[in-house]
Amino acid sequence: SWRAMEELYENGKIRAIGVCNFLPDRLIDLCRNASIPPMVNQVEMHPLCQQKEALDVMRECGVQPQAWAPFAEGMRGIFKNKLLCAIGQKYGKTAAQVMLRWNVQRGVAVIPTGNASKKTPVSGISFLMNRIWKPLRTWTKDTA
């Protein structure tokens, strides 16, 4: 239970507590009723699943968003998405690197794991902390 995790945190047994896949209404409820709010909420988040409302709520609650599927699990042809590929080509990056950058630029921590990341190297991601890329600033689901 959440209370047990709060106790572990308060006793120094764990360094952080968080949740996974909490919808905005559930996260708001937990944040209002918990002694210690969650520090992170892991959700599927990538250009085709943007989670705008959830991201807004996480920011309001002071919860760090974390994308557990920043590559859409390699599904829906995401690595061949025309816009992602065009942006990547402009900056000399792969579609995978563009997807990581998109999340990081929005303040989202990323976990590039699983089969999709094994098939798609993401080395050389130091570009993640460079200036904001204008093409990604206004990315919406409608442009994907």
Enumerate the language-model features and the residues they cover.
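Beta/alpha (TIM)-barrel catalytic core signal, keyed to glycine-rich beta->alpha loops juxtaposed to Asp/Glu
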Residues: S1-A144
